[in-house]
């Protein structure tokens, strides 16, 4: 999620207990996470240690990447964040790319169809433009049609103030006071 307060302080944050309801265990009213599933349970590959192996005191790798876009003087222009596991970086990068290409409407930024590649086949969401799909196929992409519930949250600075939006694919909303 992303927040701007009345004093102009910005916050972009991703919080997770991994799966929906985490480990499905509750202690004193708090759901316990299952973040250990983010580790690789194969400690070695080809005789070499795997970077994301389980070890005491280690934290698992994460794609969480709440992001700010700033002016040259450090003034926030946009903040974006999303849940979504290993797809998070692609979700956030898609919003930033659309913003850099001139789309500054917060609702359009978070609701556009996703296209992601996580070092394998290319995932396209329903509604992805057919002509762009054809370009990817022509370049040799192995295309898979998938549903993607990103849950993006974005705030953009416009000439008229701030505009926020929440991804319509998940529960969430933008609010201003």
Residue spans of the language-model regions?
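Cofactor-centric catalytic regions
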Residues: 127-177
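Proteins synthesized as precursors that undergo proteolytic processing into mature forms
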Residues: 1-146
């Amino acid at each position: 999620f992303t927040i701007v307060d009345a004093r102009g302080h910005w916050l972009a944050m991703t919080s997770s207990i991994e799966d929906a309801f985490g480990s499905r265990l509750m202690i004193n009213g708090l759901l316990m996470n299952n973040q250990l599933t983010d580790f690789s349970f194969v400690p070695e590959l080809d005789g070499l240690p795997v970077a994301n192996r389980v070890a005491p005191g280690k934290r698992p790798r994460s794609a969480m990447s709440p992001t700010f876009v700033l002016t040259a003087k450090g003034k926030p222009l946009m903040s974006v964040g999303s849940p979504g596991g290993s797809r998070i970086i692609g979700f956030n990068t898609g919003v930033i790319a659309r913003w850099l290409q001139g789309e500054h409407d917060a609702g359009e930024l978070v609701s556009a169809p996703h296209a992601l590649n996580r070092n394998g086949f290319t995932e396209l969401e329903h509604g992805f433009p057919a002509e762009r799909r054809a370009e990817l196929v022509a370049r040799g992409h192995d295309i898979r049609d998938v549903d993607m519930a990103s849950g993006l949250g974005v705030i953009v600075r416009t000439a008229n103030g701030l505009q926020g939006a929440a991804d319509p694919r998940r529960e969430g909303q933008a609010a201003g006071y």
